[in-house]
Amino acid sequence: MERIIEAISALRAPLQQGEYDLHRLVMDALDTAGLPWEHEVKLAPRCRIDLMCGNVGIEIKRGKVEPARVKEQLRRYAACPQVEALILVTEKTVALPHTIYGKPVRLICLNRLWGIAL
C-alpha cells in the first residue's frame, strides 16, 4: 500500500481536470512506479471501484465530496473480500476513519500536493 501511496503522491494534477482525467493521471503514476492496476473493477453487483492495484482499492473523487456518501461507498468496497485496503484520492480534504471493517483506509488529498488549501 505504501508504494501505491508514494506513486500517487508524486503526481501534480492541474487544477482543472475531469474525474476521468484524474483516473488517467493516477493510472500513469502507477505505471511509472511499475505497479499493475485494473480500471473500473466490479467487486459485487452494483459495486464498481475506480481502480484495483493488487488487493488495494483506489477510489477517485473530483470536486465536492459528500462525506457520508463516500464513507458508505467505501464501506461497500471494504465489505468485499478481494479488497484488503482502500485509498481515496480527492481534490479536497475529507475526514475518514483509519480503518473500515478492519481494513486500512488512506486519503490522498490533491490540494495538499498542490501546496494550497482549498
Locate predicted features.
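Amphipathic coiled-coil/heptad-repeat helices and related helical stalk/stem segments
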Residues: 44-45, 70-73
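Acidic-basic catalytic patches of nuclease active cores, encompassing PD-(D/E)XK
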Residues: 1-42
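Catalytic centers of nucleases
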Residues: 42-54
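Conserved catalytic cores of phosphodiester-cleaving nucleases, focusing on short active-site segments
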Residues: 51-64, 77
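Class I S-adenosyl-L-methionine-dependent methyltransferase catalytic core
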Residues: 17, 112-117
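Short glycine/proline-enriched coil/turn segments at helix->beta-strand junctions
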Residues: 31-35, 53-56, 80-84, 102-104
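Nucleic-acid nuclease catalytic cores
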Residues: 64, 68-69, 78-112
